[in-house]
Design a protein with these regions (language model features):
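Short glycine- and hydrophobic/aromatic-rich loop-to-beta-strand nucleating segment
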Residues: 119-120, 138-144
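Structured catalytic core of nucleotide-sugar glycosyltransferases
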Residues: 1-131
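Aromatic-glycine-rich donor-binding/catalytic loop that engages nucleotide-sugar donors
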Residues: 129-139
Length: 144
């Protein structure tokens, strides 16, 4: 089975849509929303969707992702950003089928957009230095 982790921070306008998309995936048995102390209605909206909600103990998306991983109860974990509303309907299957079929150990998706400053000035140089085999990732911080 699959756990989907959705890190959030003030995503009241999109969280419902992302959760509903994930709920359509047959192999997902756990949806974790790890909130980074949102000031809007993100948590209230997610709670109404009957998913597991946790408040991150440290600020930042990375901390929320890490804490979600520690809380996950399944062997396959998918991270989806709460602010992306253009996911394909079968995004969870696209990301997990190669793992389930033993053709990949790790799957990283990307989308067609310009990389941001943090990606270009921090993430990519760090990947090149610490994990050269991952340096070719065009969107290492994307939420897929």
């Amino acid at each position: 089975m699959i756990t989907v982790i959705i890190p959030t921070l003030n995503e009241q306008n999109t969280i419902s849509q992302v959760i509903e998309l994930v709920e359509k995936s047959a192999n997902v048995s756990e949806i974790l929303v790890v909130d980074d102390k949102s000031l809007d209605s993100t948590v209230k909206i997610a709670r109404a969707k009957n998913v597991k909600i946790y408040t991150s103990t440290k600020l930042g998306k990375g901390s929320s992702m890490y804490e979600g991983m520690l809380l996950a109860t399944n062997g396959i974990i998918v991270y989806l950003d709460a602010d992306i509303t253009t996911y394909p309907e079968n995004i969870v299957n696209l990301l997990t089928d190669p793992i389930i079929n033993n053709t990949a150990d790790f799957v990283k998706a990307t989308f067609n957009r310009q990389a941001g400053r943090v990606t270009e000035l921090v993430a990519k140089p760090l990947l090149s230095l610490l994990f050269p085999e991952l340096a070719h990732f065009s969107q290492p911080l994307s939420g897929m």
